[in-house]
Amino acid sequence: MSKYPFVYFLRTSKYSGIDNFIEQNKDKLECTLEIIGENDLDKLNNLFDNSKYHILVTFGDSDKEYIPMIMPRLVDRMRNRWFHRKTIDNLGDFNKNVNCCFVFNAIMNREDVRPKFSIFTTCYNSYDKIYRAYEGLKNQLLRDWEWVILDDSPDDKHFEFLKQLSKTDKRIRLYNRDGNSGSIGHVKNEAVSLCRGKYVLELDHDDIILPDLLKDTFEVFESDKEIGFVFTDFANVYEDWRNFNYGEHLGKGNVCYYKHKFNGKWLDVCSCPGINNITTSHLICLPNHPRMWRRKVLLELGNYSEFLPICDDFEILLRTMCHTKVAKIHKLGYIQFMNNDNNNFSLIRNGEINRLGPNWIRPMFYEMYKVNDVFKQKGAYEDEKYIEKDMTQIWKRKDYEHKVCSVVSNPNYDKQYCLLGIDALNDKRISELYKNSRNDFMLLSNKISSDDLVKELEKRGYDRMKCFGLSEGTTDC
């Protein structure tokens, strides 16, 4: 029987003389030890699988020579699982070091030894599309994450495909259900239950999160312990990166699209509204993707409803908005892909979603949990006529008052400048302000379209700016 813990013993070739000593004394080791060198550094990824390799030991004159090898491959919390030895003269001391390090990590606060973020994805015959989601994860500035994939495909063929992905990165934890459910609320409930991170993110199998999403979200959560949910703006695109949007009256008049350049393409980015009793009343008003919870909060809310094969997201978001503090990171964080034939799994069920959500879930939930009263207490209540009868865009309401309970964070910028009309670009101060990457700009016009504003920004070299245009606007808009 193998002895615990399992240990990687990393030494560079110039210290390979220690190998003979270890081989000669292997029966005296109180662990299972594998010697690796500078050509085996990819094996360090196995340390993300706590069940396989527990401890890392480095050997040589100084631990500093190993830092450039190790830290790009591991994460900060793993420093507690790594110790360095300059010499090994006494196996008793070495065995003590190894087992103390092992048990210390086993009995530490669980949050300190587990990933900061759990990303959970449920999938059904995703195949190559899931690599797009994986690329977005690999590019994250915050690398301390795990990806929980729960496969709900009807046979094992797809699961065998996914195994090839999980072999390359032990941050991926792959699970297969005992049979196809088809009920997305049920499967998401199970996926969340498998997560270990302090924070959780729902990621669709074929979508992309932007590189700074996890980092920014982690900082928002850590800045305020009362925040239980974070969301950002998002964009919808087809497989060929053509823009898709839901029209100017999305979100019961509370939402607009602005143009933002990402990877050389100008995307229609949906500016998700703040949270109040109106924006919470329909799924198209609530935060779309990304959705990020403090895991403890999501579980306290009861997790996704296993009863709901559709509208599961609407129901859990209603609970979330009513019961925890919410923050918005006011920037593009998520790109959602649509099939070119509009045949997404969610779109197929739109008829049922649009029947069940507004006609049954919303009114019954609002009545059972007195949602309007909840938002009155939060100072985020608007006239209930806007829930069903009046969808006028908020910038056209002369009596509109901005009442929301969500807080806003914008970590990339110190200042935001709103430029009214294209002539504002002629102001000489703009070119100087634009040189500072910590300044953000939104160009607004009620005379020309967003597409024409984009052309003007490109021509002037201001493609870091965002813009929104109403070609048929009025002076009041």
Question: Which residues does each PLM region occupy?
Answer:
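Glycine-rich, basic loop-to-helix element that forms the pyrophosphate-binding segment
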Residues: 178-195
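Catalytic core of nucleotide-sugar-dependent glycosyltransferases
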Residues: 332-340, 345-383
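Short aromatic/hydrophobic "clamp" motif used to bind/position activated sugar donors
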Residues: 200
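A conserved acidic beta->alpha catalytic loop
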Residues: 151-161, 179-181, 204
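Acidic donor-binding loop at a coil-to-helix junction in glycosyltransferase catalytic cores
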Residues: 309-316
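Short, acidic, metal-binding catalytic loop of nucleotide-sugar glycosyltransferases
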Residues: 25-29, 135-144
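N-proximal low-complexity "stem/linker" segments adjacent to membrane-targeting elements
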Residues: 2-7, 83-136
